[in-house]
Amino acid sequence: MERIPSAQPPPTCLPKTPGLEHGDLSGMDFAHMYQVYKSRRGIKRSEDSKETYKLPHRLIEKKRRDRINECIAQLKDLLPEHLKLTTLGHLEKAVVLELTLKHVKALTNLIDQQQQKIMALQSGLQAGDLSGKNIEAGQEMFCSGFQTCAREVLQYLAKHENTRDLKSSQLVTHLHRVVSELLQGSASRKPLDSAPKPVDFKEKPSFLAKGSEGPGKNCVPVIQRTFAPSGGEQSGSDTDTDSGYGGELEKGDLRSEQPYFKSDHGRRFTVGERVSTIKQESEEPPTKKSRMQLSDEEGHFVGSDLMGSPFLGPHPHQPPFCLPFYLIPPSATAYLPMLEKCWYPTSVPLLYPGLNTSAAALSSFMNPDKIPTPLLLPQRLPSPLAHSSLDSSALLQALKQIPPLNLETKD
């Protein structure tokens, strides 16, 4: 059985060591023992301090995050609306920071530009200080401009003194126009250039009217020409000219009028000529022209003797379009016997539009019911030649001696 040393008394054989007193222990060093004990207690205290430090650190981190979120929310509210619309949906924190940075850069660039302009203005004022002469010149220019403006305003108000609805906008427009004229230096040229314009507009309708008349301008549907008269028939053209038909003008336009005169067979009229024909001719259809046919003797006379006469139809075998009512001025009454003998086998009725007595004498022996409507000539202007009472009386006597004209028609 093993011995337990603590339970057994010390052996007697061993010498008894003297006991240590408190005074002897005062000089001994126990530092190593103290350090070991101290280190054990420090470890326990550091663990406790970590546990106690975790709680305020969490609070501090939470407060820091709260401050960051609050600042981002304020930046989001301060951002312009056009920057907010660039992104769709909810604005994240990173997006808010990016937009804020972009906006700050734009503001910085704007501020830099403004500062550069301010510096340029300051340097310009410092480099180019106005001297006394420059100030006087500027004052003189200002005074002259003010006087010019005041003069224009007074003139404009004087011109429009009677107008009640005068507006300030009209005055401002007038001043702007005057300033532009002064700057361009063309105040004297513009009235000269603008003056002929109304004349052009006034002349334009007459030109259009002339062009719209077409080739049928001088065409008379009652009396038609086929070709130019010969040299021996100048009296007929003179009579036509004196009657107001414009024979001299028809001589020059004869070639251009021939296709329109020859269109009697095919009825190829232009629009303007058709309108003039409707106004001057009767409304009878072309088939009723057979009522106007003359006797065989008269047809032979038309085809043989007077083929070149300008008062007959276009074709020698075609019956004449109308009876030969010639318009002769009163001064030509001396040639009546020659006309009766040479031009027509019987008496020729003479009619002058300017004389009412001749029309009365003609109506005395002519029945107006028997006269077809195409035979009535349109009223023309009187002859420019002055006719005396002697001529009119001679013409009246000649008309009274004319026998009634045979107007019976064939079926």
From Swiss-Prot:
Q: Which PANTHER family match?
A: BASIC HELIX-LOOP-HELIX TRANSCRIPTION FACTOR, HES-RELATED (PTHR10985)
Any one Gene Ontology BP term: negative regulation of DNA-templated transcription
Q: Where is this region: Disordered?
A: 1-21, 186-293
Post-translational events: Ubiquitinated; which may lead to proteasomal degradation. Sumoylation inhibits its ubiquitination and promotes its negative regulation of the CLOCK-BMAL1 heterodimer transcriptional activator activity.
Q: Which gene encodes it?
A: Bhlhe40
Q: Know the name of this protein?
A: Class E basic helix-loop-helix protein 40
What taxonomic classification does the UniProt entry list for its organism?
Eukaryota, Metazoa, Chordata, Craniata, Vertebrata
Instruction: Tell me where it resides.
Output: Cytoplasm; Nucleus
Q: Which location does the Swiss-Prot or TrEMBL entry give for the cross-link Glycyl lysine isopeptide (Lys-Gly) (interchain with G-Cter in SUMO1, SUMO2 and SUMO3)?
A: 159, 279
